[in-house]
Design a protein with these regions (language model features):
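Flexible, small-/acidic-enriched active-site or ligand-binding loops
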Residues: 135, 192-223
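Helix-loop "lid/cap" segments that line or gate small-molecule binding pockets
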Residues: 93-101
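Alpha-helical interface subdomain recognition
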Residues: 1-88, 100-105, 112-117, 130-133, ...
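Short beta-turn/strand-loop junction motif enriched in small, turn-promoting residues
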Residues: 62-64, 126-129, 145, 153-155, ...
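A short core secondary-structure module
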Residues: 137, 150-198
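A short, Trp-centered hydrophobic/proline-enriched beta-strand micro-motif
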Residues: 116-124, 168
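Short Ser/Thr-interspersed hydrophobic loop/turn segments at strand-loop and sheet-helix junctions
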Residues: 53, 76-80, 101, 169-171, ...
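Short Gly/Pro-enriched turn/cap motifs at secondary-structure boundaries
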Residues: 113, 128-131, 155-158, 177-178, ...
């Protein structure tokens, strides 16, 4: 990454890079073929991450986290992003949404996540409500001091089966100048709670060892004490997490793109055809030039967004531009890398084919490329009254 960093940030990047090389990369092919990370492997990664201070680095020191700023977290995510989410999930972070916990909830949910005793999941996507969050069908009906939840969530991603879910459900309707609008609230629901079931989702061609789950709620009764924040605050709570999630996706895409570029450069310098390295052919060398240029541009967008977040100035448009460009950039670089490697680029002996498959998901989750373009264009046109 050819970007000016402080000495502390450079040390962080080097430290995470070593962790990835020594602890994660050697397991990559094994977990890809197994379709999941074993409990033993996951515990070893998590314990090493805790020892090195990476785990929960995004949360404040006041709750036992690392207290890193967003720029440092982007640097960290960029390095961790070079490997499968299935592996780096064990070394990363609980969601910042848990900072909305009250004192009782902190001891039950937040603090165990900080120490690695528990793992949460974020459940907002539904079979009929992906990008259109407000069309969610999951409902929570008030019943005295309880809420009764009915509905389902899918594409709930996690490196392991979660201990509890942060579930978003409609709890009523508000009248707004634009008409009725669903009031969305968040609930903390434990695995095994009556009326709540977690099952494995279908296997995905991308991020094969990164698990996805289906969450089903059938008259699931939870108390007021299980609500995260206040009623109707669900989308407000989720907004910051979603925005920063797009920056983390962008950072991870840059990490994988750098890995693809390095592999392609090495291959182009050593693979010979017609008595010369294929990197000497213009078709290959121009691909490499484009790859390096696009990666640099994406890196700058990611760091720009992260630094604005540190200053409290990041907008939804900043996050959307970051996620859009970086994910589309990774798609192009992955395709170039396969082409440069030829037939070997599609063989499991090399990581190229996995990185190529994994790249496809980045343009879909955390908001599709089309949604990002909608956010960006809306910010451009609305000031003009369009």
């Amino acid at each position: 990454m050819d970007i000016e960093l402080s000495s502390e940030q450079r040390m962080l990047a080097d430290s995470v890079q070593s962790f990835v090389s020594e602890e994660l990369l050697p397991l990559e092919l094994e977990v890809e073929r197994a379709g999941e990370v074993s409990a033993e492997q996951g515990d070893r990664i998590k314990n090493k991450a805790i020892e090195m201070g990476f785990y929960a680095a995004n949360l404040p020191e006041s709750v036992g986290g690392g207290g890193l700023d967003y720029t440092s977290l982007a640097i960290m995510e960029r390095e961790l992003g070079k490997v499968s989410h299935a592996l780096h999930g064990f070394a990363w972070r609980p969601t910042e949404l848990l900072m909305a916990c009250n004192d009782e909830q902190k001891s039950r949910y937040l603090l165990p996540c900080v120490t690695g005793e528990k793992v949460e999941c974020f459940a907002i996507t539904e079979p009929g409500a992906g990008s259109d969050i407000m069309s969610m069908a999951t409902r929570a009906k008030s019943d005295g001091s309880d809420w009764i939840i009915n509905g389902s969530k899918h594409f709930v991603s996690s490196h392991v089966e979660p201990d509890f879910a942060i579930v978003f459900a409609a709890t009523g309707t508000d009248d707004t100048p634009r008409g009725p609008r669903k009031r969305v609230s968040a609930f903390l629901v434990d695995r095994g709670h009556p009326g709540f079931e977690i099952t494995r989702g279908p296997r995905c061609v991308s991020q094969r060892a990164y698990l996805n789950f289906v969450l089903s709620f059938n008259d699931c009764r939870v108390s007021d004490a299980q609500m995260l924040g206040e009623e109707g605050e669900g989308l407000m709570l989720a907004d910051k997490w979603i925005k920063m999630g797009r920056v983390w996706v962008g950072a991870g895409c840059c990490g994988r793109a750098e890995r693809l570029l390095e592999l392609s450069l090495e291959w182009a310098a050593n693979r010979k055809q017609f008595d010369q390295p294929i990197g000497k052919f213009q078709g290959t060398s121009f691909k490499l030039a484009d790859m390096a240029t696009e990666l640099q541009a994406a890196d700058l967008l990611v760091m720009h967004a992260a630094r604005k977040a540190d200053a409290g100035e990041m907008t939804p448009t900043d996050a959307a531009m970051c996620k859009l460009f970086a994910s589309e950039m990774l798609h192009r670089l992955a395709d170039h890398a396969v082409q440069i490697h030829g037939g070997m680029g599609l063989m499991e002996d090399l990581p190229i084919e996995r990185l190529w498959r994994d790249a496809r998901l980045e343009r879909i989750w955390e908001g599709t490329s089309e949604i990002q373009r909608h956010i960006i264009s809306r910010s451009l046109l609305r000031p003009l009254g369009a």
